[in-house]
Amino acid sequence: MAGEMTILGSAVLTLLLAGYLAQQYLPLPTPKVIGIDLGTTYCSVGVFFPGTGKVKVIPDENGHISIPSMVSFTDDDVYVGYESLELADSNPQNTIYDAKRFIGKVFTPEELEAEIGRYPFKVLNKNGMVEFSVTSNETITVSPEYVGSRLLLKLKEMAEEYLGMPVANAVISVPAEFDLKQRNSTIQAANLAGLKILRVINEPTAAAMAYGLHKAEVFHVLVIDLGGGTLDVSLLNKQGGMFLTRAMSGNNKLGGQDFNQRLLQYLYKQIYQTYGFLPSRKEEIHRLRQAVEMVKLNLTLHETAQMSVLLTVEENDRKGPPTSDSELPKDKFSQANDPHVDSMFGANLSEKKNGEGQVLFETEISRKLFDTLNEDLFQKILVPIQQVLKEGHLEKTEIDEVVLVGGSTRIPRIRQVIQEFFGKDPNTSVDPDLAVVTGVAIQAGIDGGSWPLQVSALEIPNKHLQKTNFN
């Protein structure tokens, strides 16, 4: 009997050893669960790879690792992401963005009235909830959930193309302030896109996971999330692998778009003062906006950035340069006349038919100018930071880790403002554009049973939590 047991034990050990050795040569399993960051301005999708423990943020067909959260409706199709962005200026009334601001949210008539005036598309009130009116062959109404579903479908298709297999399960992030209705509406949008949501995770918690803080010895974590259109500041308490969102504050109308607008207003003023006309063609305004965005991105790495945009002017629109700021349209221009810009305009207009001429507007923008135009906005970032410290009954010296999330936190002056306030450098070890999607992908890997095993983030519900907004 003892001999038989010895033989059996040896056989089991042999099988285990063979399995282990074979495992070294077998291809790694394909991820089964995707992680989604459905952002207000941009959205992205990632996966956690078993074996390597690495996260891959999946690009679209053109190599973009995030896509604009925009959906355009035309007579022939519905366009999403960058295709929608290209239609934003030529088809503004049918291009929906910021849908995340409205999903599952109940508005008072006064709140909704204030929101309606901010958008070129029609925002309708349906018993306190929002619907959008768009025209594609006929006038229809679409819900924020439907707009979200089109974005999620695009992300799902990107993941399926990359993985080479169908995808049905996902983990998705939402703002910590989202109530149950907003969370369920987000899940509904995912269901419309053919996705089953295994878990909803708060964006600050996802960011903390991306930075590895779910495994680190820290207690007080401050997450500053500054994207294209919103600022969110969250104070997290970490106990073991559990996160409690202790306080939240922010500004739902402060972000990279506002910084762009300041520079755009400045450039409009330069054009008007020199030529006496304003760009009016939609495609030229679109090119100007694209150029401004590129300048902003370049200034995160360099002290100066060049821009060049070809503009068209009608002969009867040409005027002499205005002699004072009083001749400028007051509702469109900042009044700063900063010396830190070197503008070079074509001396002559190249003539075209029908009395048109073209102007090559070229200029060099300095980082100092960009910072000067936006300094008051940069300082506003500190207001919600001070608020969460007050609500959390903490001094700024008691914060163990300050982490940055969102593309706008790349701006050097913003990092400097935060560093000066806390007296120490914020944690910038993770790409701020990808922090949330990276954390969500890690959680997706955990929920999908991927190995090597990670420490899951457990979120403690805080029913008394309310976000303080400074809009």
Swiss-Prot record:
Residues 1-22 form the signal peptide. It holds the Pfam family HSP70. InterPro entries: ATPase_NBD, Heat_shock_70_CS, Hsp_70_fam, HSPA13. One of its GO terms (molecular function) is heat shock protein binding. GO terms for biological process: chaperone cofactor-dependent protein refolding; protein refolding. Gene3D superfamilies: 3.30.30.30, 3.30.420.40, Actin, Chain A, domain 4 (3.90.640.10). Its main location: other. Residues 315-337 are annotated as: Disordered. GO terms for cellular component: cytoplasm; cytosol; endoplasmic reticulum; nucleus; plasma membrane. It is found in: Microsome; Endoplasmic reticulum. Keywords: ATP-binding, Endoplasmic reticulum, Microsome, Nucleotide-binding, Signal. Binds UBQLN2. Belongs to the heat shock protein 70 family. Has peptide-independent ATPase activity. This is Heat shock 70 kDa protein 13.
